[in-house]
Curated annotation (Swiss-Prot):
It comes from the Bacteria. It comes from Histophilus somni (strain 129Pt) (Haemophilus somnus). The lineage of its organism: Bacteria, Pseudomonadati, Pseudomonadota, Gammaproteobacteria, Pasteurellales. GO terms for molecular function: ABC-type D-methionine transporter activity; ATP binding; ATP hydrolysis activity. This is Methionine import ATP-binding protein MetN. Its main location: membrane.
Length: 345
């Protein structure tokens, strides 16, 4: 449904060329949700704006629904954009129009019959859960409600593609989850292909089928969410995944944690990261029995990304130095990532 081929975008800033996108290729199949994740300034917003040619690429092809948008005339492009909805971090609602009238605006611009407009807008407001707010003005809505109005408006022309530009970054966590749930429902019920950009891996984890990691204008890693979470190949992808872990060690451990052992009775605090089959296997208990070490679990978290289970355990590991070393080797051989956080004792 969306195919980017060798997209580059160069801006001229004060007489100097600034490369925002460098030979980016990406494909999103029909009906899937793809997340593009990267830090601020990585090129995410430029990338998504190239898809509907709000930013025209310096080079490369943008193919949406088998049509290369870069080859269209201005009038043809206007027509093609009707099939591409877009929502933004800031909702861009018209304060002088009610919820109903904001959603109706794209249809009015198309000179749609008033009866059809009412039927369409009522259906969309039911879909986003705001039918009872149809006569309310944006000033009297919460942030989450405003984003729901923006989503309904983006769907007014029955697009085949929905672009989401940091659509949840201005929302609180609970509202973010409700908007993500709505986007997933829209994807399932309407079959709309969704491409979203974000700097939050939690967003990707919750609703995406595939993910692409962008850094300094280049896509450095892409694949299914399950594959990326279970086997991230780049340091940046690993860092984004680690950001979804909420590590809480007891305060007494944090205060006494040292980078190196202070004496013979200092024991390591180790983080064990599990993905896929290693999550369900009793590897820690097997290692404890086999090598004679004691593991005191201090913190743990298990979650899902796509259909892949992943998580971590942080434990104080007590035993002979050689036994602890063998424990780490055994777990790494069974696809567990091992990181010594420090020493206590």
């Amino acid at each position: 449904m969306i195919k980017l081929k060798n997209i580059s975008k160069v801006f001229n800033v004060s007489g100097k060329n600034l490369t925002a996108l460098d030979n980016v290729s990406l494909e999103v199949p029909q009906g899937q949700i793809c997340g593009v994740i990267g830090a601020s300034g990585a090129g995410k917003s430029t990338l998504i704006r190239c898809i509907n040619l709000l930013e025209r690429p310096t080079s490369g092809s943008v193919i949406v629904d088998n049509t290369d948008l870069t080859q269209l005339s201005d009038n043809e492009l206007i027509h093609a954009r009707r099939h591409i909805g877009m929502i933004f971090q800031h909702f861009n609602l018209l304060s002088s129009r009610t919820v109903f009238d904001n959603v109706a605006l794209p249809l009015e611009l198309e000179k749609t019959d008033k009866t059809q407009i009412k039927q369409k807008v009522d259906a969309l407001l039911n879909l986003v859960g705001l039918y009872d707010k149809k006569d309310v003005y944006p000033a009297n809505l919460s942030g989450g409600q405003k984003q729901r109005v923006a989503i309904a408006r983006a769907l007014a022309n029955s697009p085949k593609v929905l672009l989401c530009d940091e659509a949840t970054s201005a929302l609180d966590p609970a509202t973010t989850q409700s908007i993500l749930k709505l986007l997933k429902e829209i994807n399932r019920t309407l079959g709309i292909t969704i491409l979203l950009i974000t700097h939050e891996m939690d967003v990707v984890k919750r609703i995406c089928d595939q993910v692409a990691v962008i850094n300094k204008g280049q896509l450095i890693e892409q694949g299914s969410v399950g594959d990326i979470f279970s086997n991230p190949k780049t340091l940046l992808a690993q860092e984004f995944i680690h950001s979804t872990f909420h590590i809480n060690l007891p305060e007494e451990y944090m205060e006494n944690l040292s980078a190196t052992p202070k004496h013979a009775k200092s024991y390591p605090i180790i983080k064990f990261e599990f993905t896929g089959r290693s999550v369900d296997a009793p590897l820690l208990s097997q290692a404890s029995k086999q090598f004679g070490v004691d593991l005191s679990i201090l913190s743990s978290q298990i979650d899902y990304a796509g259909e892949v289970k992943f998580g971590f355990v942080i434990a104080e590991v007590e035993g002979e130095e050689e036994a602890i070393t063998q424990t780490k080797i055994y777990l790494m051989e069974n696809n567990v990532r091992v990181e010594v956080l420090g020493y206590v004792g």
